[in-house]
Amino acid sequence: MKNLDNVKRIADDIKTITIQWATNIAREACKIMEQELRNWKFESHDELSRFFNEASQMLIDARETEPLLRNAMKYAKSKLKKWENANQIADAFREYLWWIEREEDIRPKIWAEIIHNWDDVFTHCHSKSVVDILLKARNDWKKIHVYNTETRPLYQWRKTSLDLLNAWVPDTMVVDSSAWFFVDNTLWNTVDIKEIFLWSDCIKPDWTVINKIWSFSIWLSAWNSWVPLYVVWSLLKVDTTDKVWIETRSGKELRPEAPDWLDIVNFAFDRIPHKCITGIITEFGVIRPENLMREVKKHYPWMLE
């Protein structure tokens, strides 16, 4: 078996969050797989397959809930079944990287058109993709004001706010617990929210969206007050497995001195029903949730194999 030290180093960096964010994780995993496949000489297809399977599984196990990473390995494996040349498998990883870069470039240019001049926009947690759309709208000379949550316990809003303020986009932080009330224009209309943009940590085949905790309450308020809610997502990040896993955080985060016999429920994520999502903003346009798998089959059929 070929040496897997370089792959293990990247896997360890992913596991310890030295490498973080979905796109960065997938990008580094693809790069190391391409590098190692080109560097090693394989004597047979069986040897190539063993190396690929062990290396790819090591990377997947480092962040098993990350579909963009898992789909990268799935795409390359679909080519492994057809080709025997390691360089061709490496080319598959390079192609996947190109898809990621294309998606990041195309989406903000097209779907910033959803935002209109003078709109008050709301977002939750931090997402570079969401920020890119907001900055593109600003670069198109649209005067917008962004409201975003604090996003406890890691306070990702600080990154969102810094990116926006550095680009001279007016920004206001809203505490998590009042976000649902803030966005409901029927209960409190001092600020008239026009659109809500949410990132997603996972979209399932049944169109369910899994995202940072408080997303469900924000969705419920948007539904109640007819505020359009968009999920910013790439088809490459659709999780085609049936497994639904909602991450929880330690109860010690809330009460470090809590007695051992006290159970504390501390969800890190929740679920957004698909029925009132206005659209999913993808690299192929804004699509309705119920059309999600049809678009996956059309553009990335290997994901459903």
How should each PLM-predicted stretch be described?
Residues 127-139, 219:
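Histidine-anchored nucleotide/phosphate-binding helix
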Residues 74-117, 135, 144-192, 196:
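Ligand-binding beta-strand-loop-alpha-helix segment within the catalytic cores
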Residues 7-16, 54, 90-94, 141-146, ...:
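Glycine/charged-rich beta-loop-alpha catalytic/anionic-binding loops adjacent to active sites
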Residues 149-305:
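Conserved phosphate- and dinucleotide-binding cores of soluble alpha/beta proteins
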Residues 23, 120-121, 125-131, 153:
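Gly/Ser/Thr-rich loops at beta-strand to alpha-helix junctions
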Residues 54-81, 92-96, 100, 109, ...:
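Non-catalytic, soluble scaffold/interaction modules
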Residues 1-89:
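Long amphipathic alpha-helical segments
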